[in-house]
């Protein structure tokens, strides 16, 4: 394993002395490198589709943008969703080999949060995920933390603590939260602090002690970020703004020749006549270059970025029949391979996150969860013809891979247990009636019954 050094978000703490820890924490926050943070914040702006104008406006003069607004595109979230297929369908979480509905009910919005977390982890290269318990609503809640500072003890590779900003305020009064875990008999800490290193107790925790003993923060780290997608989005935004300016200028720039400088400002319009001196001319000059070529150049930016990330783009003006499911699978083979490479990262993270959830629920006396936990990530499916789908379902039923209950959920995943039981009862009743009718049709009929039936 190669070690190319720690990032600016990793800080070494010399020892467990409380005062040294406090000084190190405060100093680390002040030494945050602006460039790395700025790049990350730009990526977040483009992912959440906010504040994108400011990243494009800097490449244009103020006069240009008085004529048209900037033209940013939602490239980054679309690339992130297309690339991160692991949580496209919610995974199944097993506890001692069974699904625990009690846990699923208390883990509020876990599936949607993990999906967004996976996309940001891929985009940023590293992302953190915090679990907390909402006592008022009696549920676990999750928070994605893109900007987190990690703290390490000398000689260790596992983080001892974390801090993150909670209130930017102004530049002189920023607020942060610090968590650390129990280590060598020393209780972990939990408190709020400011830029000067002054600590503040969080309500209900005057001792500033971590009640869980472990950090309620987990993380996923990729070998590299995907900032090339962000840069491509900026480039596409610049190009699209240029195209918008070109469209605005298609009518052309009014040009006069053969007139004095003092006459350069002339009122014009369909209800105004322009009197030109002898030898003077007036015309509109349009910019050269076709819009089609400019649009094709934008497509090249997008296509190249997609290829670099094992993706492909099917443009709206593409011709031909829609590809079949098998053809789509072949076209997506590189992305499917990337999905397989994502599994180890998130299996390990799911285990760490579960241990945090388990501990928090125990501390709040909500429930005790087993140690055995397993995540089954859903397989990627592609559209099939009706005939193919029916044959597949029948094969699964015939071979015991799917039950009638599974079949009902396949067509209606939102059915609750009561609806399922009612529907299964109807199916069983109809089946019994069919069997009875077949039996009656096969039984011999006596001469008397024939006479009675005929009458």
Give the location of each predicted region:
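C-terminal anchoring/interaction modules
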Residues: 2-6, 263, 269-277, 282-287, ...
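Extended, charged amphipathic alpha-helical segments
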Residues: 200-334, 363-367, 375
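Extended, regular secondary-structure scaffolds
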Residues: 119-124, 128-219
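Intrinsically disordered, low-complexity boundary segments flanking structured domains
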Residues: 34, 71, 81, 112-119, ...
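Generic detection of long, well-ordered alpha-helical segments
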Residues: 100, 107-111, 119, 226-233, ...
């Amino acid at each position: 394993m190669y070690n190319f050094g720690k990032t600016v978000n990793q800080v070494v703490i010399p020892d467990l002395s409380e005062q040294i820890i406090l000084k190190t924490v405060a100093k680390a926050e002040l030494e945050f490198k602006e460039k790395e943070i700025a790049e990350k914040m730009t990526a977040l702006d483009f992912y959440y589709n906010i504040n994108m104008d400011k990243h494009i406006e800097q490449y244009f003069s103020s006069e240009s943008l008085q004529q048209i607004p900037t033209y940013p595109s939602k490239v980054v979230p679309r690339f992130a969703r297309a690339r991160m297929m692991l949580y496209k369908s919610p995974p199944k979480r097993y506890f001692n080999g069974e699904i625990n509905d009690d846990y699923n009910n208390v883990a509020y919005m876990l599936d949607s949060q993990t999906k967004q977390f996976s996309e940001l982890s891929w985009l940023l290269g590293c992302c953190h995920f915090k679990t907390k318990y909402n006592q008022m609503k009696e549920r676990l809640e999750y928070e994605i933390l893109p900007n987190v500072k990690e703290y390490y003890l000398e000689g260790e590779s596992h983080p001892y603590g974390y801090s993150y900003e909670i209130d930017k305020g102004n530049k002189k009064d920023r607020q942060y939260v610090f968590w650390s875990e129990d280590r060598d008999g020393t209780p972990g800490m939990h408190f709020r602090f400011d830029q000067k290193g002054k600590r503040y107790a969080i309500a209900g925790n005057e001792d500033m002690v971590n009640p869980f003993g472990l950090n309620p923060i987990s993380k996923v780290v990729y070998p590299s970020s995907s900032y090339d997608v962000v840069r491509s989005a900026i480039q596409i935004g610049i190009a699209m703004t240029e195209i918008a300016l070109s469209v605005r200028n298609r009518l052309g720039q009014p040009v006069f020749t053969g007139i004095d400088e003092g006459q350069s400002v002339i009122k014009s319009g369909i209800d105004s006549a322009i009197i030109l001196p002898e030898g003077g001319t007036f015309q509109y000059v349009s910019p050269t270059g076709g819009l089609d070529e400019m649009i094709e150049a934008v497509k090249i930016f997008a296509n190249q970025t997609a290829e670099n990330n094992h993706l492909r783009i099917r443009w709206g003006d593409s011709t031909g029949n829609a590809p079949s499911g098998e053809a789509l699978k072949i076209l997506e083979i590189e992305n499917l391979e990337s999905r397989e490479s994502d599994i180890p990262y998130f299996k390990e993270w799911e285990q760490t996150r579960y241990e945090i959830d388990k501990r928090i629920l125990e501390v709040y006396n909500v429930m005790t969860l087993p140690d055995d936990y397993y995540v089954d990530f859903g397989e990627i499916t592609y559209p099939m013809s009706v005939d193919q789908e029916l044959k597949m379902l029948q094969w699964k039923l015939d071979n015991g891979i799917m039950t009638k209950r599974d079949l009902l959920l396949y067509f209606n995943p939102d059915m609750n247990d009561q609806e399922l039981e009612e529907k299964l009862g109807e199916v069983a009743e109809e089946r019994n009636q069919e069997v009875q009718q077949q039996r009656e049709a096969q039984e011999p009929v006596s001469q008397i019954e024939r006479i009675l039936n005929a009458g």
